[in-house]
């Protein structure tokens, strides 16, 4: 994102993806009006709400292909996802994304796929929790380096709201197996230090029978201050 923004402001900058290097020459940087697109990862949690409960539209979302891989997994599950109004603003691809309540089916997510959607894994797990059949997310060893407790936190949160989630680990394979339930029961959830796990659990509570609370909601508020206020709406800009 920084390279794109610098180019927009007049920088003579070249990005070589083959060597993963950036070459920037002395340049005259000029100020300009900048449009900041919506964060895709945050949008995914609202979209998960739409897939489980009804129509949700997220507007002006950044849709850089390196960030949107989780949508392919959603679609493999049978999710009704539509991307509209694609355009470029300040060098960034943005669009509006619509998610509608869907009849979801279980899938297998390989460890490489899981690593590529690391930031969206809790949201993916929550929609798997109401899919038909048993889904599996394999754990890539690099995920342990990024967040050693993530899969344990996802499993605990899902069980807290009445989901059927089993953590497995052996010398040959590790991950979580999620068997879909018709509806989450609800309950109180501790998200620890993971805002994404807390956000996913909050989505589950909105579609649960009894509701519940995120006991350490301040963790979510610190990272996404508007999340709790807007949860339950059906349009986000």
Task: Tell what function each PLM region has.
Residues 1-237:
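Short, structured segments at the rim of ligand-binding sites
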């Amino acid at each position: 994102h920084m390279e794109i923004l610098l180019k927009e402001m007049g920088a003579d900058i070249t990005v070589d993806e083959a060597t993963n290097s950036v070459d920037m020459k002395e340049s005259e940087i000029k100020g300009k009006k900048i449009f900041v697109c919506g964060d895709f990862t945050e949008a995914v949690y609202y979209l998960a709400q739409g897939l489980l409960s009804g129509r949700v539209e997220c507007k002006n979302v950044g849709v850089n292909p390196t960030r949107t891989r989780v949508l392919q997994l959603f679609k493999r599950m049978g999710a009704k996802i539509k991307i509209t109004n694609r355009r470029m603003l300040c060098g960034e691809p943005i669009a509006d994304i619509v998610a509608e309540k869907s009849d979801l089916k279980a899938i297998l997510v390989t460890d490489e796929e899981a690593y590529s959607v690391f930031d969206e894994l809790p949201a993916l797990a929550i929609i798997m929790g109401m899919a038909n059949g048993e889904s599996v997310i394999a754990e890539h060893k690099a995920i342990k380096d990024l967040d050693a407790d993530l899969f344990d936190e996802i499993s605990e949160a899902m069980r807290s709201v009445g989901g059927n989630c089993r953590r497995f680990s052996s010398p040959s394979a590790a991950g979580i197996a999620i068997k879909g339930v018709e509806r989450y029961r609800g309950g109180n959830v501790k998200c620890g230090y993971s805002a994404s796990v807390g956000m996913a659990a909050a989505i589950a509570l909105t579609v649960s029978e009894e509701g519940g609370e995120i006991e350490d909601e301040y963790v979510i508020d610190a990272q996404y201050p508007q999340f709790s206020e807007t949860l339950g709406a059906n349009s986000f800009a």
